[in-house]
Structures are given as C-alpha cells and as structure tokens.
C-alpha cells in the first residue's frame, strides 16, 4: 500500500466508528497481494450508513465531502437518500468511500464472512482475501475499470477465485454472455489508470507495456488463462 494510505489508516485506528466497517476494495486487495498501486480506501458496512456519524468524522478530520452526481436521480427513483448507501470524502488528498451495498448478494457475502475479518490496526478490520476477491468479481461485472480487469486476472492466476465462481456470477450478472465474451466486450471507461511501483509483483511484466496497450494485453492474458483453467476443470 502507499505510505500515505497507511498513515491515514493509522489515524483512523483511534476512532471507534471504524468498528462498524470493514476494509475492502482495491487497496485492501493490494494489502494482501502487493500487485499494483491503489489510491483510495473503501469501507463496507452490511447495514445502512450512519450519515450523522460520518459527517462528524469528516469534520474531525477536516475532510471534504464529495457529492455524488447520482444523488438526485437516486432519490427520485427510490425515495431514499443515497447517503444512506454511499458517502465519499477527501481525507488528506485520499478518497475514502463508505458504502452499504445496494445488492442483497454483496450484503450477504459481507455478513457471511465478517466474523473472519482480521484486525490490521486498532478498530480497523479487513475482510478475508477470498471475500474481497468475491466482491471484486461482482464489481467487475457492474462497471468497466481497467483495475478491475487486472485484479480479476491476478485473482484467477493465483487461484484465489476459480472459473466455476466466475461462470456463476457471469450467468447472474451477464445472462446472455459467456465470460470470454464479457472480456471481449470490455472497454475501459478511462476513469482510472493502472499503475505499478517497483516493489509491486507485476511491475516488471508491465514495465515495457505502454498504458494504452495494457487493456488489450490483460484481455488476451485473462481470456487464455480462463479458457485453460475451465478446460482443466472439466477433465
């Protein structure tokens, strides 16, 4: 993890509010795997957010609230406040998102595995690697971010997830497409970059690959790996 993120997590560790949340997302994955740079922090809670407490936290840390552009549409469509599901802040230049999954499956996964969480700082608990991987896989099917694509490749390569789980969630989220077809249709939305530091495990592999060529490279590698593993699983 970036040293700035470690410092911020240490600051958070003095606040008991974080006992209600679990560290997940790309940075939590990088904590386990050291596979790439991740620039933000995600905390999940398997119940609706306590927005007044989060606002108090932001004031305490002099953090800047990041409004969600979809908040008005969400309220019109659901009659609810998006802040009960997701709130984002800028803490010392680092984006920190607190969220309650608006998805029964994700909520069930967090509730299923939260007793297996591990304390990495006082009041800061990280969910198991397998749980974070499962949540990442679901996120991959819902958006088009190159970091997610890369993460799925790493998780499959390291056998943290398998083709059976991928196929199950592909059928759930992309009913009409096989996973190789999902990969082929993938197009990065350009909102994030895929970056590495020399100490990251995949730094050497990607060092000579230009940023604009990395998506195609990962898609090819992931497709080959998935097809190979799926064939092995059917034997």
Q: Where is each model-derived feature located?
A:
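Compositionally biased terminal segments of proteins
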Residues: 1-235
